[in-house]
Structures are given as C-alpha cells and as structure tokens.
C-alpha cells in the first residue's frame, strides 16, 4: 500500500508491530515510531523527544511527517484522547476514542458495558472505601480478587488468599476506586479482534503468563511470557467469542455513541460454568502481540488501515503460519515491585544468531526485552527461546 505510518509507543509490543509490518511487506522507510527505543531505532526512524500523551505534539508530528495511518500502542495515549485529536486532523487512526478506551481505562465502565450487552463475566462489586472492600471480600470469600478501577500498567490486580495483602493492595489504589470480584478458576486465553466500529476480525489466540516467577508464583506483572497457537481450544472457540463477546461489546459501544475502532483485547477464562470475560484492553497486549504477530502472514498494514477507515468487512480473514511462537520476557531484578538501575545488556548479537529467534526491545528497566522464538512445535520453539536467553546477561 506504501503509506507513511506512525506508531506511538516505546516497548517490545511496538517493536513487534514494527517487525510484523516489515515482515508482511511494509518498507522500513515508511515507518516512524515515537518515541521508540534503541532497538527499534536500529530498524526504523524514531522521534524520541515526543510526549505521546500530548495531543498537540502528536498532531504536529503527524502533520509534519505526512502520516496517513497512526497505530497507538499503549493505553495512556488512548485514555488521553490522542486518537480523537489525530482523527480531527484527518489522520486514519488504529486506536479507539477516549470514550471507547474507557473499556480498559475503567473496570467499572467495562462491567457496565458487559452487563448491557449480555457478555458473560464474573460477579463484581464497586467499592469506594476500605470498609466496602472488606465487606465485599467477606461476601465473595477467598481467593480474593481485588482490582484497581483504572490504569495501573498491568499491576492493578491482586489474586490472593491473604486478606491482609488484598486489603493493602486495595488501600494503594483506593483513590481510583476498587472492584472486588468473584474468583474464577480455569485456563486463561487472550484473543485479539480488529474492529472498525461495525464489524470485527479475530486474530489467533494466545496465552500469557502474568506471574513474576516460575511455576505461576509471585505477583502479577504486565506479562512475563506467552505462546500461540493454543491447540487445546475447542474447535468453535473463536466464533463463539466473536458472537457472544466481541460483537455485542462493539455494538453496545456504538449504541453509547462511542464506536470502537482499533484492537479489542478479550482477556478470557474457560471455567467449568463456561467462558467468562476477565478484562478488556483497548490495544495490543504485551507480550501476546509478540507471538500473535510473529505468526501473521497477511499484510498487517492493510488490515489495520481497513479497520481504521471502516472497511474491515471488505478484508479477507487474517492468515497465520502453522508454526508455534513462544516469547519469554527478560526483566530486571525486583520487577514489578521495584526498579533496578539501568545496566548494559550483553549478548544480544549471540542471541539473535539462534535459529528462529528475534529480539523485541522493551524498556531500560522492568521488562527489558522479549525473546521471540518459532518452531514446528511448542518444545522446539521454547527450547530456542531459552537457548537465546542463556546468551544474554543483564
């Protein structure tokens, strides 16, 4: 298609989007990333000094650079209304409006939308005081699920049997409001849908691992690893989620006067009572994006532009390779509770020489990078990922 593309963001997710665009036919010279990071800057041009939540600064950059498609990576610019501002300048934007992005920005708003749309989800209670949190915890019982009712960089949720830890977490985020929810047990699935506000297109399912340590131990994080596809899913799973979750949600937002144009991330759990929605995100998930887009064959530029311009119904379904993709996140020590000092990463070139491996660079602290590996089966892909990781020191 050969259009000028702006990607907002600076993490491994945005690096994965860049790599997928290039892999599926976009020229690197047509991509600009703001602010980007050192790894992304090795592949495409970056505008490192931009505050991507500043609507005026982003508008100015887009107009100066002749941007035809803007892709918004993280949640903060969406909630700040950057997509609305860019659209007002005539730029096609893949990313929902400020109002529609409240699907992620406010857990209580998401619950209201799901209730109105008849989307299956867990029981929840909105709490404004610690006394209300305590009462809700008592009513629902352990394990306790306590969620910040706002953006918290993937760290706003605690699931624990320890009531003191749950209350401490609630106290930390009580200024946002708190949701206490019933605990749901089962396998979790992340399923992305492209949406143009009228129709949706599913991508391939993935599963991510949110706990900080091995064997699903430790605190929740933004995500420590993921894999795709999920061969254990029921045959009609994707169609079922499209019919019972994605389309009703999109239609309800349209009814509210806030058409959702962008990426609807459905965080799902398969319980013994059926499928339930745990959460929605209003953008590509990190680290699931790294494995989903690694397997994409269809030109990503075309898919996102059709979604951004309201023509998704004219697009053929996204196609994916049969390979398995695995990503493992390398994080600095102390993550997510504390930040280690910035240190030089060594061994990247050696890791990149491992067959079937790519590195997506994240931030200088916290989730530093994602090693993405593909293989004919899960074992082969996983082995390649850890072989590459063994060559990296932080």
Language-model segments: what does each one mean?
Residues 94-156:
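A conserved helix-loop-beta module that forms one wall/lid of the active-site cleft
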Residues 46-53, 125-129, 158-160:
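Short acidic-hydrophobic, aromatic-tinged amphipathic segments that line or gate anion-handling sites
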Residues 242-264, 281-356, 360-362:
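Active-site "cap" helix and flanking loop/linker of ATP-utilizing ligase/carboxylase catalytic domains
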Residues 364-394:
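Generic C-terminus detector
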